[in-house]
């Protein structure tokens, strides 16, 4: 058993760690609320844009945009959104596992894959994973802007336009609630059809000035908005996961301190008992 002084030093060390994790928990909670506000603001736009584009994909236009044409998936691209920092539980690990499982299926089907990692952890992982990394972005901060992503996303769009990609997906952690964040893979290109219009499609939009001019701009904007929404959702998920992880660390530190204090008291009691025994033995000898 360690002596009382060593145990006391250990208790002080754990208490200092507990203060740090408690502070990180509070910071993460504050950042999560801000991230939730940004997510709530952008989510209706992204969801409605998805519905509109899904309806367009069901339509019978004379002009067929390349993003509406389904091609054989010989080469698949993934835009993978992760965090820049750690200390957020298994958030990134679970995301990467999902991507790796999907990549395995694509490769078994004979497709080649390439990646566009967003976030330092994603960049680090896919640089060592294998497969072409066509573009990347990191250091976006807690309040990213769409302009920060446009250059990276358009590298993948250019590859799709040139026929170097036949499928394009975005992968991120979808924020469900504070305790639950789910890794998802969503198809960006070719445009997925709207589930609501899958059974019946009895109306269509009127396009002004003409479908080509409108769709050439709208469809690019759609892809950018979906990636941005993925980034915003991932940030909210990151802060929620970090808050939960830091709370667990703080609680564990508290339990460890209690256990160490018990050990300290036993060690102190043993030392006192030893001293008393020595005193009694000395007195008896006299």
From Swiss-Prot:
Q: Which GO terms describe its biological process?
A: proton motive force-driven plasma membrane ATP synthesis
> What is the topology of this protein in the membrane according to its UniProt annotation?
Peripheral membrane protein
Where does the record place it?
Cell inner membrane
Tell me the keywords, alphabetical order. ATP synthesis, Cell inner membrane, Cell membrane, CF(1), Hydrogen ion transport, Ion transport, Membrane, Transport
Keyword Hydrolase annotated: no
Q: Does the keyword Transport apply?
A: yes
Q: Which ranges does the record mark as transmembrane?
A: none
Q: Which residues form a coiled coil?
A: none
Q: Name the Pfam families for this protein.
A: ATP-synt (PF00231)
Gene3D superfamilies according to UniProt: 3.40.1380.10, ATP synthase, gamma subunit, helix hairpin domain
GO MF entries? ATP binding; proton-transporting ATP synthase activity, rotational mechanism
Q: Which domain of life is it from?
A: Bacteria
Record-level GO cellular component terms: plasma membrane; proton-transporting ATP synthase complex
- Membership in a protein family: Belongs to the ATPase gamma chain family.
Tell me, how does this one assemble?
F-type ATPases have 2 components, CF(1) - the catalytic core - and CF(0) - the membrane proton channel. CF(1) has five subunits: alpha(3), beta(3), gamma(1), delta(1), epsilon(1). CF(0) has three main subunits: a, b and c.
Primary role: Produces ATP from ADP in the presence of a proton gradient across the membrane. The gamma chain is believed to be important in regulating ATPase activity and the flow of protons through the CF(0) complex.
Protein name listed in UniProt? ATP synthase gamma chain
| Organism in which the protein naturally occurs | Shewanella woodyi (strain ATCC 51908 / MS32)
The organism that produces this protein has a lineage beginning with: Bacteria, Pseudomonadati, Pseudomonadota, Gammaproteobacteria, Alteromonadales
> What gene name is listed for this protein?
atpG
